[in-house]
Each structure stands twice: as structure tokens, then as C-alpha cells.
């Protein structure tokens, strides 16, 4: 299947550059796979589409401060995005600007050495004497809002580019389907008999790297660590046994659950089920665990768009996106959402 089949025109004015004034006040496009219908609602009305016995699974990862400005010896500005640790003394970063192996980059009194160019726009950095890079980012970096917002991080992003249930630090991007969720809506869902439970998946490099091949089958996904607590596994089993639905709040939850699906049945004991999700879900793939998906509107040619198309069906999703653009929905991280039933 061709990557180009998942391109579409996204006008700049349809990209939400800032969060809504009030969390949860966004719109919700509802896609019904069985009837092939598209309808319109508000995110705060999510509880009217779920029912007693359903299980809503959340990703409780917390976004870390990961965006740091540095400069070369020439004075040229370089933007660094911390992606992950590479051993104990080196880290992978996504960079914007001209950088080569051996360059030295200065920021806030520290000098990083570019050890290696790993991929297009990805480098491995170190500090002198084997010191860890993480404390420098923790002290001086900003919230890593997406580059397509075309603006620096602002105070509003510190709160709003984080979910209300963020707990375990480790992501370099938010699980954006959850940004519109509010404590009040979660309470209404629970009062209506909808169970909730959490997993942790730390969003990493794969979120930022574009697909550079023509055929989906050739694309290799980056690994992302996940942890599914034993309590969540038990809730999933109980929900399935009673005929309830597993509602994935976002593509990160979907990837973690679908990657772990074959291991869940045999997992026992008090400890979590942990792994590294490296599956690329695109049309033609089957889903073993999730029954519904709440997610955002995704960028053209992105892996998360392809995952969403795999779940909704490519033709139905294209029709839904066209309708959303016609009705001026807000797209991408700070935008509106879709519920696929």
C-alpha cells in the first residue's frame, strides 16, 4: 500500500495553533463503522456514546521538558529535541539546523559534542567527562510543543500540553487525544458505569520522524516503551468476558494494547506487562483488543493517520476528514477529536 494514498490537503488555517480557552470545549466527530455514518457532537458529550460496562483505557505518561536552543561555534542557532537516553552517558536528539559529527554545541554554559549523526535530523550527543545530558534539559529546556505550530512554547503550554492525569515522566510529545479530557468528564463516565484504567507508553522518536519510503510495508517503526499494570490487565479481561467494549483513548494506547495482545492472556502475577511497541498498524492489519478509538485529527502521511484508517476503514475515514474540513474542525494536537465506534 502506498504512503501517498494517505496524503490530503490540510490548510494552515485548519491547524489549531493554541489550545481552546477551556479544556474539553472542543468538537467531536463521531464515526460509526457499522453504519458508515458520520455525525457531530462535542467532546464533553463523550459519555453519551459510551455505556455501562465499557472500559476506557488512558495513557498516563507525562511530557518532559525536552526542547532546548543551542548554538554552534559560528553562532548559528540549533534547536535540539531530547528523544531518549542512549546508554548512560549519551542521548539521542532531534536537531533543526546544519550539524555534523564532531561539532560542538553550546547552551546555558554547557558544551555538547555531536558524537554521531544517526539519521536524517537525529544525532547522538554527549557532555564532557561522561556527564548526563538529562539534567541540562530539565533545568533549561522548554515544553516540546510540535514544530508545526510554528511558534515558541508559551506559559499556556506548560499546563495545556499535559493531560490532567499525567503521572509518569518520559514522553517528548503528549498523548494528544487526552488533552481535551477533564476530571468532570471522567467523573460522569464513571458515574455512568464506564470503567477507566491506565497504561504508560512514553512517546518518542517515532512521533517526529517522517515516513521516507513509498510503500508502507517498507517503513520501520521506532520502539516505544510501555507498561500495562496488572490491575489494567484484569479489567481488560473482565470487560471482554462481560461483553463490554475496550475504548482506547488515543493511538498510543492502541499501539501498546495491540502490541501486548498476544501476551495478555498468559500474563499473571502482581507485576506489570512491559515491552517496546514497534508495530506499524496500517490498513489491512487486524485489531485484537480495542473496540473503539478516541483520537485527534492527524497530519497527512503520518503513521497515526494510517493507524486510524486501519481501524475506521480508509474510505470512511477519507469521507469523515473531508466533512471535518468542510465544517471547519480544528486539526492536530490542540484541535478537535474523532470517536470511531
Curated annotation (Swiss-Prot):
InterPro entries assigned: QueA (IPR003699), QueA_dom1 (IPR042118), QueA_dom2 (IPR042119), QueA_sf (IPR036100)
Q: Which Pfam families match?
A: Queuosine_synth
Which HAMAP family is this protein grouped with? Answer: QueA (MF_00113)
Sorted alphabetically, the Gene Ontology BP terms of this entry are:
queuosine biosynthetic process; tRNA wobble guanine modification
The Enzyme Commission number assigned here is 2.4.99.17
The subunit structure is: Monomer.
Q: What reaction(s) does this enzyme catalyze?
A: 7-aminomethyl-7-carbaguanosine(34) in tRNA + S-adenosyl-L-methionine = epoxyqueuosine(34) in tRNA + adenine + L-methionine + 2 H(+)
Similarity field: Belongs to the QueA family.
> What role does this protein play?
Transfers and isomerizes the ribose moiety from AdoMet to the 7-aminomethyl group of 7-deazaguanine (preQ1-tRNA) to give epoxyqueuosine (oQ-tRNA).
What is one term from the GO cellular component aspect held by the record? Answer: cytoplasm
Q: What is this protein called?
A: S-adenosylmethionine:tRNA ribosyltransferase-isomerase
Question: According to its UniProt record, where is this protein located?
Answer: Cytoplasm
Pathway of this protein? Answer: tRNA modification; tRNA-queuosine biosynthesis
Keyword list (alphabetical) reads: Cytoplasm, Queuosine biosynthesis, S-adenosyl-L-methionine, Transferase
Kindly list the GO molecular function terms attached to this UniProt entry: S-adenosylmethionine:tRNA ribosyltransferase-isomerase activity
Q: Tell whether Metal-binding is among the UniProt keywords.
A: no
Amino acid at each position: 500500500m502506498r504512503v501517498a494514498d494517505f496524503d490530503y490537503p490540510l490548510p494552515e488555517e485548519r491547524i489549531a495553533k493554541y489550545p481552546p480557552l477551556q479544556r474539553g470545549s472542543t468538537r467531536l466527530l463521531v464515526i460509526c463503522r457499522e453504519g458508515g455514518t458520520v455525525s457531530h457532537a462535542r467532546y464533553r458529550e463523550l459519555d453519551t456514546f459510551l455505556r455501562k460496562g465499557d472500559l476506557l483505557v488512558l495513557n498516563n505518561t507525562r511530557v518532559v521538558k525536552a526542547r532546548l536552543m543551542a548554538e554552534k561555534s559560528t553562532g548559528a542557532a540549533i534547536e535540539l529535541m531530547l528523544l531518549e537516553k542512549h546508554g548512560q552517558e549519551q542521548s539521542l536528539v532531534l536537531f533543526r539546523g546544519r550539524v555534523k559529527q564532531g561539532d560542538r554545541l553550546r547552551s546555558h554554559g554547557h558544551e555538547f559534542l555531536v558524537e554521531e549523526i544517526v539519521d536524517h535530523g537525529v544525532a547522538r550527543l554527549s557532555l564532557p567527562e561522561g556527564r548526563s545530558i538529562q539534567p541540562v534539559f530539565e533545568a533549561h529546556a522548554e515544553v516540546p510543543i510540535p514544530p508545526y505550530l510554528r511558534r515558541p512554547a508559551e506559559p499556556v503550554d506548560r499546563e495545556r500540553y499535559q493531560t490532567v492525569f499525567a503521572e509518569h515522566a518520559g514522553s517528548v510529545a503528549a498523548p494528544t487525544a487526552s488533552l481535551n479530557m477533564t476530571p468532570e468528564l471522567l467523573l460522569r463516565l464513571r458515574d455512568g458505569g464506564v470503567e477507566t484504567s491506565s497504561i504508560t507508553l512514553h512517546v518518542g522518536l517515532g512521533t517526529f520522524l517522517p515516513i521516507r519510503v513509498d510503500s508502507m510495508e517498507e517503513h520501520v517503526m521506532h520502539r516505544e516503551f510501555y507498561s500495562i499494570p496488572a490491575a489494567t490487565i484484569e479489567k481488560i479481561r473482565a470487560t471482554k468476558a462481560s461483553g463490554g467494549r475496550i475504548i482506547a483513548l488515543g493511538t498510543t494506547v492502541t499501539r501498546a494494547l495491540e502490541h501486548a495482545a498476544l501476551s495478555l492472556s498468559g500474563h499473571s502475577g502482581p507485576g506489570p506487562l512491559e515491552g517496546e511497541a514497534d508495530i506499524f498498524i496500517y490498513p489491512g492489519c487486524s485489531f485484537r483488543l480495542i473496540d473503539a478509538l478516541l483520537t485527534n485529527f492527524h497530519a497527512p502521511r503520518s503513521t497515526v493517520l494510517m493507524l486510524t484508517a486501519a481501524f475506521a476503514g480508509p474510505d470512511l475515514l477519507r469521507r469523515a476528514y473531508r466533512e471535518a474540513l468542510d465544517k471547519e474542525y480544528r486539526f492536530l494536537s490542540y484541535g478537535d477529536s474523532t470517536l470511531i465506534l
